[in-house]
Amino acid sequence: MDKQFSFQGQYDFKTVSTGLYDSWSSASFFKPQKNKVPFTAILPPPNLTGTLHIGHAFEVSITDQIMRFKRLRGYGVNWIPGFDHAGIATQTKYEKLARETNPEYFQAPRKQKVKMIMDWALTQGDTIQSQIKSLGASLNWNQVNFTLSKKASQIVNDSFIQLFEQGFIYQAETLVNWDTKLNTAISNIEVINKPVDQQLYYIAYKLANNPKKRLVVATTRPETIFVDVCLFVHPKDKHYHSFVKQKVVNPLTGALMPVFTDSYVDKKFGTGVLKCTPAHDFNDFALNEKYRLPFVSCIDHNGLLNEHAKQFTGLTVSAARQQVVEFLQTQKLLVKTMPLTSNVGFSERSDTVVEPLLSKQWFVDLPKLKKALAIKKYPELIPKRFNKQVTRWLSQLKPWCISRQLIWGHPIPVWTHKQSGALHVGSTAPTDKQNYTQSTDVLDTWFSSSLWPLICLDWHKNKHFVPTDLLVTGYDILFFWVLRMTFNSYFQTKQLPFKQVLIHGLVRDAQNRKMSKSLNNGINPMDLIRDYGADATRLFLTSNHTPGDDLIFNEQKLKSAANFLNKLWNVTKYVLQLGEQAKTVPSTHLPSTLSERWIWAKLKQLIVQTTKLLDKYQLALANQALVNFIWNDFCNTFIETIKQEDTALLPQLYTTAKTVLSTAVVMLSTVTPFLAERIYQQFHSGSVMQASWPTAKAVKPPKLFADVVEAVSSLRHYKANNQLVANQNLAVVLSGKAAPVVQNYFHFNWVDLRIEVNKTPGFQIKIVDNAANNLAHLEKQRSFYLAEVQRSQAITTNPAFLKKAPPHKVKAELLKLEEYQKKLAEVNHLIAKLTKAE
C-alpha cells in the first residue's frame, strides 16, 4: 500500500505517472519469469530516422495491452525491443543534416562516413527508446536488438551465403526502380505514387513500305522513343489488322520496328497502339521477356540521356522531353497533344521521379524459394480476411532485388576476381584478397529485417529456434516484411517465426486522410502524452479500432478518454473517504444489500466478458466494457446507492466498493497502467504488475435490482428529456409488493416519492406529474426523430449516394442513422413505460 501518494486534489496525469516506469523496470517486472509458460513477441523495429510517430504509438499501445494481459494471466512474457538501421532512410536523413552541420562528411572516406552515421543513429535510438517508455510499454529492455549489430551481421551474412549456395540468390541485369538523385535501386514500398498533370503526345510512326500510312501512338514519354523496339496492337482490334507483322520507322532514329499483337494492349487508351520500350517501363519489360526482343537504355543512372539519344545526349529527362517534342513537331510527326492526369512514381526519400532503369543487382528468387520450402501452413492471420490477400501475393511472387548502392547497411559479402570475374561469397575475404574487388553495395534493409526473429532470439548462438507467439504489425508491410520473415525464418529453421499475426491499420486524420509530410497532417504522440497523458492516449488508441481496420483520429474521443480517467480518480477519492467514514461505525455482520449482490454479479459478468474478448484480441470491445462498467455500473449506480444506504452498512459497503474497484483496476491496468497502479496501491501492498487476472463464473444480477437500475435510468431520461418547471420535482408513485425493499433507491432530491404497497409482485413506478404536457413534449420529440430516421434511410439506401460518396461520408451517414434510431427507441420507451403503471 502506497501511503506516500495522495489522492487529494484534482487528477494530474503527470503526478500520477512520475517515477512509476522506473520502479517497474528496477523491479524487473518486464523480464520473463522462467518458471512460467513463455509468451514471446518481438517489437517491429522502429527506424532510427527521428522520433516516434502516431503509428508507432498505436502499435505499441495495442501490443502492450496484450502483453500486460498475458502477464496477469500467468505467462512469462518476453516482449523483445529493437531498432532498424533503415538503410536509405537513415543515410538520406543524416546527409541532409550533414549539409548544414557536418560538411566534412562528404569528403570523408567510406568507413568514416559509416561511423558518423552510426554515432548519430544511436542517439536517435536513445530518443525513441525514451519515447516508447513514456507510453508505459512493458518491453524487456535487457534484450534490446539492432539490425546493424555484430550479432545481426553474422546472421545476415550466414543467411545470404546459404541462400546463395543453394541457388536462391543470384545476380542479374534487369529493370529496377532507380533513384537518380541518390543513385541507388529502391524497393516498391519506397516509391510514392502522386497524381501529376501531364501531356499525352500523339506521335506518328510511318509504315516502312508505305510512308503515306502510319500508326499513331499516344505516350507521356516521347524522350524514350530512341530505344523503342516495336509497336503492339490488340489482336481483336480490327482497325490495325493490316499493320500486323509489318514494319514501322522509329520517328527519332529511323530504325525499323515490327508491329505485334498482344491482349495486354488497352484498346481504349489513346489510339489503341502501344509503343514498347522495355528498358524504361516495367510493363513493357514484361512484354519484352515474352517476345525475347532486344532492349537498350537511353537514360543513364544520373537521369541524363545517353549516347543513344543522339543530339539530345546529356539533357535531363524533362529538358529532353521538351526538345524531342519540338523536333517531332518540325518533322510533322506530332499529331496532337492532350492533357492527362496520371500517377507518377516519386522516391519517398529524395522526392525525385523514379526511373525504371536497367541495372546489375542481386536478387532473391522468391518463387523458387517458395516452391522449395513448400510451407504447408502459414502463421494465423487476424483478421482472417487477409488470408485471401496473402494467397494472391504468393501466387504472384517475383524476384526480390536486395542490393542497394548505399554505404549505410550490411555490406554484401561478395568479392569479384579482377581478372576472371569469379565470385567469392563468404563472411570473410578470400585469402588472396589483393586479386579481388569487394562489392560496394549493401543489402536492402528489408533483407536484414526479414531475419528479425532470428536476431531477437539469438539464433546464431542457439540453433534451437523457438517461434514467437505473436506479432502485431500493420497491413501495409504484410508483404514486404511478414511474408519475407516467414520465408527466411523457415529456410533457416524449418519453423514459422510466429504463431499468430495480429494486423492493424493506419492512423488517419480526422478527414480520413493518410498522414503525410505533404499534407502536414502528422500527429506527434508526444504532444498527446504531454496534453492528455499516456493513459488517455493509450485508452483512445486501443478503444477506437477493430483488428485490420484504420483508426480515424478524433480528439473529442481522446478527451472522452481523459474524462473517464478523471471520473476514475474522483471515485477512488470517494471510496478512500468512505473508508475513513467506515472506521467510525461499529463493524457488524449484516446481509449483503441488493446493490452489493448486483455489483458483484456485474463484476463477474465483466470478468468473463473481457477475458474472452482479450483472448481474441478484441481490445476495443474489452475496453468499452471496462469503461462502461466503471462509469455506469460502479460509479453512477452502485456508488450512488451507497449514499442512500443505512450508515450501519458503511463498513461492508466500503469493503465491497474497494474490492470491486481494485479488481476492475487490475483489468484496466492493461490499458491505463499508470493510474491503475496508483489506485491498486491504495488497497494492496506491491504492484498491480504482480497481481493475477481475476477469474469468475458469470451469474445473473438480481432481477429486482436490475429493475431498479432500469427504472432509475428511465426517470433520469424522463427528467432530462422534459421541460420541467424550475424547482418542480417529479411526483412518482412506487407501488407493488417490493416497494418497501427498494424505496431507498428512489430517494432523490428531484423526486417526490409516494409508496403504495400492494400484492403485485415486484414493483411499479408511475409518474403523475404534469403527464399531459410531458407526453406532448415526448410526442414532439418522437416526430422529429422519426423524420430524421426516414431521411437518413432514404440517403443510405440511395444507390447513387453509395456509389459516388467517399467511404467516410457513407460511414458518417450510417452512424447518424444509428444514432437517430437509438434516440427514437429511447423516446418510444419513455412514452410506453413512464406514463402508465407497469
Swiss-Prot record:
UniProt-listed SUPFAM superfamilies: Anticodon-binding domain of a subclass of class I aminoacyl-tRNA synthetases, Nucleotidylyl transferase, tRNA-binding arm, ValRS/IleRS/LeuRS editing domain
Coiled-coil ranges per UniProt: 768-838
Domain characteristics, as noted in the entry: ValRS has two distinct active sites: one for aminoacylation and one for editing. The misactivated threonine is translocated from the active site to the editing site. The C-terminal coiled-coil domain is crucial for aminoacylation activity.
InterPro entries: aa-tRNA-synth_I_CS (IPR001412), aa-tRNA-synth_Ia (IPR002300), Anticodon_Ia_Val (IPR033705), M/V/L/I-tRNA-synth_anticd-bd (IPR013155), Rossmann-like_a/b/a_fold (IPR014729), tRNA-bd_arm (IPR010978), tRNAsynth_Ia_anticodon-bd (IPR009080), Val-tRNA_synth_C_sf (IPR037118)
One cellular component (GO) term of this entry: cytosol
GO molecular function: aminoacyl-tRNA deacylase activity; ATP binding; valine-tRNA ligase activity
A biological process term (GO) from this entry: valyl-tRNA aminoacylation
Lineage top rank: taxon: Bacteria
Localisation per UniProt entry: Cytoplasm
Binding of ATP, residues: 517
Protein name, entry field: Valine--tRNA ligase
Keywords: Aminoacyl-tRNA synthetase, ATP-binding, Coiled coil, Cytoplasm, Ligase, Nucleotide-binding, Protein biosynthesis
Source species: Mycoplasma pneumoniae (strain ATCC 29342 / M129 / Subtype 1) (Mycoplasmoides pneumoniae)
Subunit structure: Monomer.
